[in-house]
């Protein structure tokens, strides 16, 4: 079996698998490979346990500006449309209601203004008053005593929307389709990349077991591991990494759909939200928490897996200065300490209950169950030159046949949009064709019309 490929993708999560499919379906590349360190695809950040299983299109994510929401909506549409085109309803993609709520007068005023801006972007977006929310999500309004909560509440959202996705199963489908299209493609599992070497006009991707695959172009979609690989080759040395791990709590099946809350604009992390679990029936997840930890991948044991690569990246004065500046802000400091407490046995559950009751006021301590083994690390990029935290996705384009992607949320939602960008870059670099018009026709006709 030949180990030479036009392109090799490092990382078998949903982003890597989306590019594997996109190159196979729409480009003239002959052979593409994925190398993945786990024994199965999509076992880390794309696992159904690692994320909130949400297609983040911007309609109920209150930290998105209208400008960002317009872009994210188009990205989300591609992912949703792919699943619907392939007939993956109720297997990969699920329909449910969803809403964002404001609790209290200040948040309600914010939500009213937000609705006026966002109803032009999202066709069919409905505004819900307290009574309508009670009809749609009774447990958001009813208190423990059966009496309606006293706070003013307003929201907006959709009564039905294809908003829930199992990104692990989506990853598997991308790969199945790609292998049908190009039988010479290859997937290498249990292939943990040790290093990447440039050899004349090709790259050698070398595993810890001394296996080698070769490619004219390498795309690194390895989540938290992308930046250490980049720095091992001399790229991205001006960047650091702040790994933020999210945890969840289970509660009984008390929500009919997704319920999001207003996010503090100072905080670069999602506000607590409620999501009926698409995989574990009868359970609703509340979360995520946000805990910084010295690890590129989450493990059950606190001391297990502390990352030497991370220490190499972050043990410098610029990163310490960024961390000091962040912690100097009282709201951020309190948020960090509060989330540390959430992880503690016994006391953490008691402290988290108050946050969870913002969504379901009748919740009791007995209703909360820490979701062991759920949640994963999201790499937040630190710019050492600008001395600040960079929110969102980060890409290192070398223009030398290798690109590195760091894709925290909403990276899974945007997987096909990111795959489009990467596939066009790869095809252009290799002198191959890419059928952009057919891509838009299949997955985003709106952009074709514009």
Swiss-Prot record:
Places the protein is found: Cell membrane
Protein name (record): Malate:quinone oxidoreductase
Pathway(s) where this gene product acts: Carbohydrate metabolism; tricarboxylic acid cycle; oxaloacetate from (S)-malate (quinone route): step 1/1
Cofactor: FAD
GO BP, one annotated term: tricarboxylic acid cycle
Function of the molecule: Catalyzes oxidation of malate to oxaloacetate in the citric acid cycle. Donates electrons to quinones of the electron transfer chain.
Subcellular location, principal: membrane
Database matches in PANTHER family: L-2-HYDROXYGLUTARATE DEHYDROGENASE, MITOCHONDRIAL
Taxonomic path: Bacteria, Pseudomonadati, Campylobacterota, Epsilonproteobacteria, Campylobacterales
Membrane topology category: Peripheral membrane protein
E.C. number(s) listed in UniProt: 1.1.5.4
Molecular function per GO: 2-hydroxyglutarate dehydrogenase activity; L-malate dehydrogenase (quinone) activity
Keywords recorded for this protein, A-Z: Cell membrane, FAD, Flavoprotein, Membrane, Oxidoreductase, Tricarboxylic acid cycle
Source domain of life: Bacteria
Family stated for the protein in its record: Belongs to the MQO family.
């Amino acid at each position: 079996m030949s180990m030479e490929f036009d392109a090799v993708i490092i990382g078998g999560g949903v982003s890597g698998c989306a590019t594997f499919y996109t190159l196979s379906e729409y480009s003239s590349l002959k052979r593409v490979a994925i190398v993945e360190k786990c024994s199965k695809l999509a076992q880390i950040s794309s696992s159904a346990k690692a994320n909130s299983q949400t297609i983040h299109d911007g309609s109920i994510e209150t930290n998105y500006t209208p400008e960002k929401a317009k872009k994210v909506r188009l990205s989300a549409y591609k992912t949703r449309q792919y699943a619907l085109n392939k007939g993956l309803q109720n297997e990969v993609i699920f329909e449910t209601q969803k809403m964002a709520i404001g609790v209290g007068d200040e948040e309600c005023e914010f939500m009213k203004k937000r609705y006026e801006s966002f109803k032009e972007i999202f066709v069919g977006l409905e505004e819900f008053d307290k009574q309508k929310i009670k009809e749609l999500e009774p447990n958001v309004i009813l208190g423990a005593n059966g009496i309606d909560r006293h706070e003013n509440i307003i929201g907006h959202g959709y009564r039905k929307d294809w908003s829930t996705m199992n990104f692990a199963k989506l990853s598997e489908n991308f790969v199945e389709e790609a292998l049908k299209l190009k039988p010479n493609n290859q997937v290498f599992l249990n292939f943990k990349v040790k290093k990447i070497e440039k050899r004349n006009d090709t790259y050698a991707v070398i595993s810890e077991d001394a296996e080698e695959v070769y490619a004219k172009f390498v795309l690194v979609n390895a989540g938290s591991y992308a930046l250490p690989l980049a720095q091992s080759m001399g790229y991205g040395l001006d960047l650091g990494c702040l790994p933020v791990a999210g945890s969840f709590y289970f509660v009984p099946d008390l929500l009919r759909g997704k319920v999001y809350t207003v996010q503090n604009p100072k905080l670069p992390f999602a506000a607590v939200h409620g999501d009926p679990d698409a995989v574990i029936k009868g359970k609703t997840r509340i979360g995520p928490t946000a805990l910084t930890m010295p690890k590129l991948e989450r493990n059950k044991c606190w001391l297990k897996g502390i990352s030497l690569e991370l220490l190499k990246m972050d043990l410098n004065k610029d990163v310490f200065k960024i961390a000091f500046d962040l912690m100097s802000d009282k709201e951020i400091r309190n948020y960090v300490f509060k989330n540390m407490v959430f992880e503690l046995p016994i006391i953490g559950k008691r402290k988290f209950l108050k946050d969870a009751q913002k969504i379901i006021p009748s919740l009791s301590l007995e209703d909360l169950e820490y979701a062991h083994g759920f949640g994963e690390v999201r790499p937040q990029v630190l710019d050492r030159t600008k001395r600040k935290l960079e929110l969102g996705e980060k890409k290192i384009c070398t223009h030398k046949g290798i690109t590195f992607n760091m894709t925290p949320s909403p990276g899974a939602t945007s997987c096909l949009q990111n795959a489009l960008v990467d596939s066009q870059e790869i095809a252009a670099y290799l002198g191959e064709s890419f059928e952009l018009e057919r891509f838009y026709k299949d997955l985003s006709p709106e952009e074709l019309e514009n």
